[in-house]
Amino acid sequence: VFLGAHETKRFGPLCVETFASTDAGVAFLISACGETIFHAGDLNDWVWEGEPPEENQAMTARFQAEVGRLSGRRIDAAFLVLDPRQEADFAQGFDYFMRHTDTVRAYPMHFWNDFSVFAKLRALPCSAPYRGRVALETEYCAQR
């Protein structure tokens, strides 16, 4: 089954809704049995140092628009990008998502086996409101 952005498909008790990516593919919101999981795929605020400011601003606007589509929905588990390659901006998308959605538990992904991003995220003052809702690196079984 192929789903493009902004489509909804039911598979028995499973409901799959897609969101546009800011890179490749789509993001998924999957609901079943009263639980909801969000998998961001490559949906992230992909801002890069050295890129033209207008490109980074357009990226941020696209990302925020997609996250806005989740407004008012409870997300039990969200798998979100936390990419160390973005250097100082590594948590920008993650932070925005957590501050603008009703997410119970967030699981960083796309961190290229660089588990140091977990501690870096926890050290950011902006993460204080949701810090306790982010999975710890010890919850990942394929560590180092």
Regions found by a protein language model. Give the residues of each.
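Catalytic metal-binding/acid-base residues of hydrolase active sites
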Residues: 22, 44, 81-85, 110-112
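Core dinuclear metal-dependent hydrolase active-site scaffold
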Residues: 2-74, 139-144
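Structural beta-sheet core signal
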Residues: 38-39, 80, 108
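Conserved protein kinase catalytic core
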Residues: 48, 87, 116
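Residues that form or flank phosphate/diphosphate-binding pockets in enzymes
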Residues: 25, 88-89
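Binuclear metal-ion centers of metallo-dependent hydrolases, dominated by the metallo-beta-lactamase
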Residues: 2-8, 69, 90-144
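Conserved acidic residues
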Residues: 76-79, 104
